[in-house]
């Protein structure tokens, strides 16, 4: 038993030392923060229980170090400490309660600041007589590397401030997500994440080289000032006055509802995490009063007056065990990696998208490789990077469809199966037809549809309406109640608006916005569209005159409404009594204000989901966009809005509340 403990301590010491080297020196960590912290905590626990095995070279004795021989080493004026950490809300609440108690005992009754924890590289800025004198990396907390000339190339670092004072500041240098992706694509050996890239750039020998890269900085703390400052709130305002870039999401909390306010703000930042233009890996809480900070003091590792609440990692490492090729309803071929189960952003991941052959070649991926998996927000998990190449070469997508064996055709970066009778394409099309956004046939899940195809009960969406559901009665999982619900759901789908049926047909480039454009230009029925498309030249001329319809979309519409298979389906649905015309005098009418307006939504709205509001506006002819661009006409803003508001303001885009649009949209229907 004792020998096992000694072996585990030795193993933990060795691996943590290796991880320290990878993180601080090589800027290429092989594990995430959570894995590292768990190992370090385990080592600390064992050493406290078995102190006879704690040696002077243990990583628990010292800070990690990013010191490099290429730069001059300079001793810090103050210890540059790390932060205490917690990974759960309960731990955060306990710390807040402790700080509230300490505040009351001291009689200072101070507040607490909350700000995003930027996932970048730490920097210490020294100003003398208002002039930037030196910039040091954190190093080992006692000594850092002098990277002054490189830091001077960062545009948001003032080289001189208005007052001739002394300042020692702490900040975080980072690179935006967008710039990280752009730069990483050009590198022979790409970086795992934006933090490592920023660190790698900062440590280039030539400041001229560094100037070519778009590094940025947030300054978040004053370690020393010749000014008299009592709180971090005062310091924050002073930093802004001097022209330093500070995080706009920093908030200060105090009073009776301090804890509730902090927890709500933390959850808001976590929810908005993916909308930030830079990477964050948590939030940092700090006592506001500098006097109380001094009273509370620090350990050798971290200040007692601050804590970091770490978010779940958006990335994880896994091994690719297989690569399969999927066929979509349009025939688009998508390679998917099957990976060993890994927890990423709170979800258990076993599959990850590989996009296309070009992406596979760029990453250099094959079965057996160790990869970084990312999952952000609702985005499908994807393979970001190969970190350990264990297989030779890159996986090659077969030249034939995995389902029907027809030769694949390349269009742009993607491969397509052009066989419209391909069983995989047909199954995916039926799934789309039954989905909530189209005909919304409740009870027909993807697995149920696959089962119906497998048993040869149906072979297209048309046969959903001719199939006798009673044939399912003796099959596993189908009882009388489920069968009756399925019958009712199929029958209910017959009353869906024409625009839902048109969307469900899966015509290329004919999405919700384009359908509404057609409807509100008097192309609001099957008969009007099909009649127009009989004369292809006249149809093309008319469609191109409609705002929002380009040549590609127009040609796809014309082709679809001259396709016998599609026309036969429409005629079948017509005979069955489905709605073949949209009511152009009711909710699909273009309002004089909303006509053709492109909009986006941010925040939450009391009493309304985003989907409901989007549908109400699009019914009136507005066009929904998922992102804020210069082409946007307005941004609809609710409570707890995100960074889209800031971006809209920067672009001069109008922002509206629900009150602003109530005259144009009936919010009560």
UniProtKB/Swiss-Prot annotation:
It is an enzyme of class 6 (ligase). This is DNA ligase. The active site is at residue 117. The lineage of its organism: Bacteria, Pseudomonadati, Spirochaetota, Spirochaetia, Spirochaetales. Belongs to the NAD-dependent DNA ligase family. LigA subfamily. DNA ligase that catalyzes the formation of phosphodiester linkages between 5'-phosphoryl and 3'-hydroxyl groups in double-stranded DNA using NAD as a coenzyme and as the energy source for the reaction. It is essential for DNA replication and repair of damaged DNA. Zn(2+) binds at residues 401, 404, 417, 422. Pfam families: BRCT (PF00533), DNA_ligase_aden (PF01653), DNA_ligase_OB (PF03120), HHH_5 (PF14520). InterPro entries: BRCT_dom, BRCT_dom_sf, DNA_ligase, DNAligase_adenylation, DNAligase_N, Hlx-hairpin-Hlx_DNA-bd_motif, NA-bd_OB-fold, NAD_DNA_ligase_OB. Its cofactor is Mg(2+); Mn(2+). It catalyses: NAD(+) + (deoxyribonucleotide)n-3'-hydroxyl + 5'-phospho-(deoxyribonucleotide)m = (deoxyribonucleotide)n+m + AMP + beta-nicotinamide D-nucleotide.
């Amino acid at each position: 038993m004792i020998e096992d403990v000694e072996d585990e301590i030795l193993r933990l010491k060795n691996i943590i030392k290796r991880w320290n080297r990878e993180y601080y020196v090589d800027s290429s960590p092989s594990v995430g923060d959570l894995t590292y912290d768990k190992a370090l905590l385990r080592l600390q626990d064992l050493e406290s229980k078995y102190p006879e095995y704690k040696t002077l070279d243990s990583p628990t004795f010292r800070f990690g170090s990013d010191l490099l021989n290429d730069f001059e080493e300079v001793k810090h004026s103050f210890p540059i400490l790390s932060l205490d950490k917690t990974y759960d809300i309960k731990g955060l609440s306990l710390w807040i309660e402790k700080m509230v108690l300490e505040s009351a005992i001291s009689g200072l009754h101070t507040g607490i600041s909350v700000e995003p924890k930027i996932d970048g590289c730490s920097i210490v800025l020294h100003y003398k007589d208002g002039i930037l004198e030196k910039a040091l990396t954190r190093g080992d907390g006692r000594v850092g590397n002098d990277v002054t000339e490189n830091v001077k190339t960062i545009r948001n670092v003032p080289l001189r401030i208005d007052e001739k004072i002394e300042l020692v500041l702490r900040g975080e240098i980072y690179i935006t997500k967008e710039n990280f992706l752009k730069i990483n694509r050009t590198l022979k050996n790409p970086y795992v994440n934006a933090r490592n890239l920023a660190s790698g750039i900062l440590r280039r020998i030539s400041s001229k080289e560094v100037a070519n890269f778009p590094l940025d900085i947030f300054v978040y703390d004053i370690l020393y000032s010749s000014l008299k400052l009592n709180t971090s709130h005062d310091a924050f305002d002073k930093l802004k006055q001097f022209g330093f870039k500070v995080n706009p999401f920093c908030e200060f909390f105090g009073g009776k509802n301090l804890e509730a306010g902090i927890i709500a703000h933390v959850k808001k930042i976590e929810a908005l995490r993916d909308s930030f233009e830079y990477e964050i890996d948590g939030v940092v809480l700090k006592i506001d009063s500098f006097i109380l900070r001094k009273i509370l003091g620090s350990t050798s590792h971290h200040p007692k007056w601050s804590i970091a609440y770490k978010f779940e990692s958006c990335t994880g490492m896994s091994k690719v065990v297989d690569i399969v090729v999927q066929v979509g309803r349009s025939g688009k071929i998508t390679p998917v990696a099957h990976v060993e189960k890994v927890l990423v952003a709170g979800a258990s991941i076993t599959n990850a998208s590989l996009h296309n052959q070009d992406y596979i070649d760029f990453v250099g991926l094959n079965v057996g490789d160790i990869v970084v998996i990312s999952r952000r927000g609702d985005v499908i998990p994807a393979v970001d990077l190969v970190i350990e190449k264990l297989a030779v070469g890159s996986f090659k997508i077969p030249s034939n469809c995995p389902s029907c064996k027809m030769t694949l055709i390349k269009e742009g970066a993607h491969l397509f199966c052009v066989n419209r009778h391909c069983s995989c394409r047909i199954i995916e099309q039926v799934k789309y037809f039954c989905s909530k956004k189209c005909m919304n046939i409740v009870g027909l899940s993807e697995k149920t549809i696959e089962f119906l195809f497998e048993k040869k009960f149906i072979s297209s969406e048309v046969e959903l309406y001719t199939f006798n559901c009673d044939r399912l009665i003796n099959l596993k999982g189908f009882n009388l109640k489920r069968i009756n619900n399925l019958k009712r759901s199929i029958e209910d789908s017959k009353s869906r608006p024409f625009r839902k049926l048109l969307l469900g047909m899966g015509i290329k480039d004919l999405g919700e916005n384009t359908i509404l454009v057609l409807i509100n230009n008097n192309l609001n029925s099957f008969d009007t569209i099909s009649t127009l498309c009989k004369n292809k030249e006249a149809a093309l001329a008319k469609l191109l005159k409609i705002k929002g319809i380009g040549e590609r979309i127009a040609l796809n519409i014309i082709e679809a409404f001259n396709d016998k298979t599609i026309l036969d389906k429409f005629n079948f649905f017509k005979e069955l009594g489905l709605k073949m015309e949209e009511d152009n005098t009711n909710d699909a009418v273009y309002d004089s204000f909303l006509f053709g307006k492109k909009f986006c939504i941010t925040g939450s709205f009391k009493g309304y989901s985003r989907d409901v509001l989007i549908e109400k506006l699009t019914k009136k002819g507005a066009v929904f966009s998922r992102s804020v661009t210069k082409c946007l006409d307005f941004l609809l803003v609710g409570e707890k809005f995100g960074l889209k508001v800031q971006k809209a303001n920067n672009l001069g885009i109008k922002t509206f509340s629900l009150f602003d649009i109530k005259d144009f949209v009936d919010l009560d229907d």
